Design a protein with these regions (language model features):
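Helix N-cap / beta->alpha transition motif
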Residues: 31-37, 91
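Acidic/polar-rich alpha-helix caps and helix-coil junctions
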Residues: 1-28, 44-221
Length: 221
């Protein structure tokens, strides 16, 4: 609904978020916090501490992560999450979509991310250009960033200041505070559909959970 059209500077979000030395300009420093990582839903569209199918107590243990382009050992916290998690967060043995070579092979433009101390994107002996959390931000970073050419500016696009989704979420929270749960769920539906999630009332019903006022307020926030 409202966007900031000013161009991003060289040391902006895209530079600071992309993996270290994948291309000519990448800072490797904007680390998603653990609190934010845990706020993303499970693959069933529920908070991970509410989903009976999600191993919440074992989330800090290790497991095998597999997808079409890369795999490896990672924390269980990074497995069986919702689509937005994988679109917005890079994690140990996950992937980052950046343009790093010529050619039509989509997999050639995907970097497997490894953040342990001596891994390719780990801290090693550096004092800067590393993620302090073991995660990197992908949200707001164009897959066309980090071309192999030198001195390529970050792809320019209008930065969303006020999103339509924010209005839906505000409306859902207002309905929830009034105890109008059905209307709150209806307001959330377009946001969840766009994110590839079932409607909130269906997700709770499938899990055998009760969707009350407090739960709906939490989902809207």
């Amino acid at each position: 609904l409202w966007a900031d059209t000013r161009k991003e500077g060289h040391y902006g979000l895209q530079y600071k978020s992309t993996p270290y030395r994948v291309g000519p300009s990448s800072g490797n420093g904007v680390g998603v916090t653990l609190t934010m990582v845990e706020m993303f839903y499970s693959k069933n569209g529920l908070p991970i501490d509410l989903d009976p199918e999600y191993d919440y107590t074992g989330r800090y243990r290790y497991g095998e992560y597999h997808n079409d382009v890369c795999d490896g050992v990672t924390m269980n916290l990074n497995i069986d999450r919702e689509p937005r998690f994988y679109a917005w967060v890079a994690f140990q043995n996950g992937y980052y979509e950046v343009l790093r070579r010529d050619g039509a092979d989509d997999n050639a433009n995907i970097v497997q991310t490894r953040f342990r101390k001596n891994d390719v994107f780990g801290i090693k002996e550096r004092t800067t250009n590393y993620t302090p959390t073991g995660y990197l931000n992908k949200k707001g970073c164009s897959p066309l960033y980090n071309n192999i050419q030198e001195d390529v500016a970050a792809p320019h696009y209008p930065w969303p200041v006020i999103r339509m989704a924010e209005l839906y979420l505000n409306l859902a929270e207002a309905y929830a505070n009034l105890g109008r749960i059905d209307e709150a769920a209806a307001a959330l539906k377009p946001v969840r559909e766009r994110a590839g999630l079932d409607p909130v009332d269906e997700a709770f019903e499938k899990a055998g959970l009760t969707l009350g006022r407090d739960e709906m307020i939490r989902m809207a926030r």
